[in-house]
C-alpha cells in the first residue's frame, strides 16, 4: 500500500499525509520526536488539493444502517485499518498512523451516534442503547 505525503504550503518540519478513508490530510510536525498527528492544518485555512488521481466522494450525512437498523461498524474500522496498514514508506519518508476519526462539521457525527458505553457484551454494541431492556418494560418482565 502506498502513502501520499506532501510538504507543499506547510511550515518547515511539517508533513501532510492523505487518509483515503476520510478523504482528508492529517498533519505531523516531524521536528518533534513523538509528535502526534492531527486533522487541523498548522496554518488555519490552509487548503491542499487531494493527491493526483484521487476520486473524492461527497460526504454522506448519516452512517448507513444494516437491515436490523443498527449502525455499521465497517466505516469506523476502515479508518483504523487504513491507518494501521499505512506503515509503508514513500520516497524514503516515514509513513504515519492516522489520528482518531475527525469530528466537526467537515466530517459529520462520530460513528455510534454519541453512545459512549462499552462496545461489547450482549446488549451494548454500536447503537445498543437498550441496555438489555425488552419490549420497553425496563427488563422487569410481565406485570
UniProtKB/Swiss-Prot annotation:
<dbReference type="InterPro" id="IPR036020">
    <property type="entry name" value="WW_dom_sf"/>
</dbReference>
<feature type="domain" description="WW">
    <location>
        <begin position="9"/>
        <end position="44"/>
    </location>
</feature>
<feature type="region of interest" description="Disordered">
    <location>
        <begin position="115"/>
        <end position="143"/>
    </location>
</feature>
<protein>
    <recommendedName>
        <fullName>WW domain-containing protein C660.05</fullName>
    </recommendedName>
</protein>
<dbReference type="GO" id="GO:0005634">
    <property type="term" value="C:nucleus"/>
</dbReference>
<dbReference type="InterPro" id="IPR001202">
    <property type="entry name" value="WW_dom"/>
</dbReference>
Amino acid at each position: 500500500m502506498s502513502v501520499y505525503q506532501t510538504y507543499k504550503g506547510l511550515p518547515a518540519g511539517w508533513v501532510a499525509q492523505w487518509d483515503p478513508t476520510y478523504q482528508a490530510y492529517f498533519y505531523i510536525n516531524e521536528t518533534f520526536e513523538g509528535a502526534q498527528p492531527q486533522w487541523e492544518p498548522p496554518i488555519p485555512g490552509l487548503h491542499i488539493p487531494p493527491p493526483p488521481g484521487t476520486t473524492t466522494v461527497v460526504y454522506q450525512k448519516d452512517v448507513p444502517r444494516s437491515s436490523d437498523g443498527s449502525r455499521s461498524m465497517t466505516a469506523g474500522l476502515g479508518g483504523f485499518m487504513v491507518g494501521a496498514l499505512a506503515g509503508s514508506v514513500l520516497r524514503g519518508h516515514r509513513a504515519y498512523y492516522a489520528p482518531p476519526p475527525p469530528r466537526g462539521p467537515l466530517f459529520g457525527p462520530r460513528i455510534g451516534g454519541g453512545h459512549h458505553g462499552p462496545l461489547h457484551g450482549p446488549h451494548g454494541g454500536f447503537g445498543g442503547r437498550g441496555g438489555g431492556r425488552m419490549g420497553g418494560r425496563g427488563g422487569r418482565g410481565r406485570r
